Amino acid sequence: MVTVFDAVADRAQRVRHPEKAHRPDTEVLRKPDWIRVKAPTSKGYQETRSIVKSHNLVTVCEEAGCPNIGECWDKKHATFMIMGEICTRACAFCNVATGRPNALDLDEPVNVAKAVKQMGLSHVVITSVDRDDLEDGGAEHFERVIFAIREASPQTTIEILTPDFLRKPGALERVVAAKPDVFNHNLETVPSNYLTVRPGARYFHSIRLLQRVKELDPTMFTKSGIMVGLGEERNEVLQLMDDLRTADVDFLTIGQYLQPTRKHHKVEKFVTPDEFKSYETVAYTKGFLMVSSSPLTRSSHHAGDDFARLKAAREKKLLAAAE
């Protein structure tokens, strides 16, 4: 993922997670072999990094320690995180810094669009920090970024991964009206974990948001993702799948939670590849058009390839219904 520049001059001395400093250190479990990946060293990785830096962008891939950064950047795949690198919320799983955000960078939409064009992206993912400080939660900024990409690189398909726009009337409607190709909003975890893992959010608000997207534009692909290994029970994951299908969500991603620091929520369990495969099988039986379920699955991992498969799955379903 990628975010815009940090205006904090003394970044090296900034306390990244002041809201978590009071927490006791948690146990860090040793990662199993199926989680480990090679360090990024390829030429493609270096070229992607150079492009990102040349447009005054900062990578949340690096900050979050995403395990897929080497693979994605080698292929010049990127997710741009807009509206700064400081979030107004403090989720227990997230490595993005929390605090008082800077003013929006009004040049960001054009800068992101330039990077998309220079990298030759056929599919791009745009995400953001939560901006509860903004009247519209950043909806207009999402809109401007989408429009800028459409102008600079008309052939690029656009996937957005949005915050929940909690208590921001009209924000969702504005973003949907900008016509992204895929609307993604992650539930992150099962509802019983929300108070400890995602305290600033509301589970059923997120479900309703995804449902509302389909009401506004029935043709728009919708997507959501969760992490497992946070202490959830299997039956809770299956119920979450049912909730998403009630909202007519097309695409589900399930990946292993990895603990950023000792101050973050601990990994309760490393879910095995066989368990991930089982979740995938069940999810397909519940009617999802696409499911990606594996230890290293992340919302934007293989997003371009998955979008092509998602379109093909819908076409196949429509043809079957017409017979």
Swiss-Prot record:
Kindly list the positions annotated as binding [4Fe-4S] cluster 1: 61, 66, 72, 300
Which cofactors, by name? [4Fe-4S] cluster
The answer to whether the entry has keyword Transferase is yes
Binding-site residues for [4Fe-4S] cluster 2, renumbered to this chain: 87, 91, 94
Q: What is its EC number?
A: 2.8.1.8
UniProt cofactor note: Binds 2 [4Fe-4S] clusters per subunit. One cluster is coordinated with 3 cysteines and an exchangeable S-adenosyl-L-methionine.
Q: Which Pfam families match?
A: LIAS_N (PF16881), Radical_SAM (PF04055)
* Record key words, sorted: 4Fe-4S, Cytoplasm, Iron, Iron-sulfur, Metal-binding, S-adenosyl-L-methionine, Transferase
Instruction: Domain (Radical SAM core): give its ranges.
Output: 73-289
Major localisation:
cytoplasm
GO MF terms, alphabetically ordered: 4 iron, 4 sulfur cluster binding; lipoate synthase activity; metal ion binding
Q: Which reaction does it catalyse?
A: [[Fe-S] cluster scaffold protein carrying a second [4Fe-4S](2+) cluster] + N(6)-octanoyl-L-lysyl-[protein] + 2 oxidized [2Fe-2S]-[ferredoxin] + 2 S-adenosyl-L-methionine + 4 H(+) = [[Fe-S] cluster scaffold protein] + N(6)-[(R)-dihydrolipoyl]-L-lysyl-[protein] + 4 Fe(3+) + 2 hydrogen sulfide + 2 5'-deoxyadenosine + 2 L-methionine + 2 reduced [2Fe-2S]-[ferredoxin]
Write down any Gene Ontology CC term: cytoplasm
Where found? Cytoplasm
Q: To which pathway does this protein belong?
A: Protein modification; protein lipoylation via endogenous pathway; protein N(6)-(lipoyl)lysine from octanoyl-[acyl-carrier-protein]: step 2/2
Family statement drawn from the similarity comment of this UniProt entry: Belongs to the radical SAM superfamily. Lipoyl synthase family.
Q: Which HAMAP family match?
A: Lipoyl_synth
Q: What is this protein called?
A: Lipoyl synthase
Species of the source: Sinorhizobium medicae (strain WSM419) (Ensifer medicae)
